[in-house]
Amino acid sequence: MRRYFGTDGVRGEAGKPPLTPEFVLKLGQAAGAYFRTQEKRPVVLLAKDTRESSDLLEAALAAGLMSQGVRVEHLGVLPTPGVAHLTKALKATAGAVISASHNPYQDNGIKFFGPTGEKLPDEAEEEIERLLLEDHPTRGIGTVGDFREAERMYLDFLLAHAPDLTGLKVGLDLAHGATYRIGPKLFQKAGAEVMAFFNTPDGRNINRGCGSTHPEALSRFVVELGLDLGLAFDGDGDRVQFIDRKGRLFHGDHVLYLAALAFGEKGVVGTVMSNMALEVALKERGLAFHRAAVGDRYVLEKLKETGLALGGEPSGHVIFLRHHTTGDGLLTALLTLKALKALGGDLADWYEALPLYPQVLLNVRVSDKAKVMADPRLGEAVREAEARLGGRGRVNVRPSGTEPVIRVMVEAEEWAEEVARELAERVRALSQEAQAV
């Protein structure tokens, strides 16, 4: 069982275990030792987001890697999917990103990509964790460089997929994060009239009241300013949420439905959080629908298993496998707008084409996720909730892979909110009991 790597790399509060400079230095040494088993002279591309702790952790990770003879190429502030793309395009040994995605500024994280541009497989992360337990004396003096073409190369990749957006008025919520520079450049070059919001990072304002997890302000701006649509990215740019001209959230399930029809897909991979309405609508059109566990790495695994090319999550992580190896908010925005051009209409029209079942998602902060999830009384509570819905809805309770919370989701035509709140209270009570023991 992995101790440090979760569903999206190593995460935690910066400066506290495990994300201390000392630990990150050792992580760099262990990762460097692993990469030395893959190539004689490894090259690792290293990028970061805009958190105040990113510089410190970047320096520690780079030092650890270089102590093992690794060449480190600094990419500066760049969206996570840009690192994945460049790792593959430049045939680097690996890519690494200092970011905690949609989490608040106090948190940070480290994730690695392999030479194919995909996240490191579980076995590789397990081997790096094993190597963390060993001492790693200096095995050479690694060198460092600043790869100044990183943003331009990533921008060129994105523009190759961009439709002509001339005349489109777009609001961009950049979350004070990694897309704050490249986002406006991209949409302006594609011809759109751009209004950028939340694009002045100060190290502490990333995701604060903005971005894909807080699109309310963008929704208001779109309506008040008469924009055609809004795009809300998260802190590292691997997801996007859309706002239609009426200020409504056009989320990942809508995107999957629209893209599947526009691009002639044979089926779609969603997750256990995907709305039942998406599954029903796709099957009515003869398209397959498969559910994966939550997390883009599991969506990718299911895509490979089923041979499909389109998958994603309601949160805005969408993988267009013919074009990229990972979720990419900027690419998703471009391809969704291309799908609209192909089918006609705007986001508001397609929002109404897929009426979603009411869904309530509550996050319950807990002291010990594993203990609460293992409590048999939680299983009983879930079964009781399902019985109350009488087969006319779904219940899903799962631990977050990146935060100390358990997510309670209830989806039903009726009673969703009431059942979700009751179940969340049961989870909270079990957590308090576990903490008292």
Curated annotation (Swiss-Prot):
The protein's Enzyme Commission number: 5.4.2.10
Domain of life: Bacteria
Post-translational modification: Activated by phosphorylation.
Keywords: Isomerase, Magnesium, Metal-binding, Phosphoprotein
Binding of Mg(2+), residues: 101, 234, 236, 238
Active site: 101
Gene3D superfamilies: Alpha-D-Glucose-1,6-Bisphosphate, subunit A, domain 3, Alpha-D-phosphohexomutase, C-terminal domain
Cofactor annotation remark: Binds 1 Mg(2+) ion per subunit.
Residue numbers bearing the Phosphoserine modification: 101
GO molecular function ontology, one term from the record: phosphoglucosamine mutase activity
GO BP annotation list: carbohydrate metabolic process; peptidoglycan biosynthetic process; UDP-N-acetylglucosamine biosynthetic process
GO CC terms: cytosol
The protein's required cofactors: Mg(2+)
NCBIfam families, per the entry: glmM, PRK10887.1
Function summary: Catalyzes the conversion of glucosamine-6-phosphate to glucosamine-1-phosphate.
Family, as annotated: Belongs to the phosphohexose mutase family.
Protein name, as recorded: Phosphoglucosamine mutase
Gene: glmM
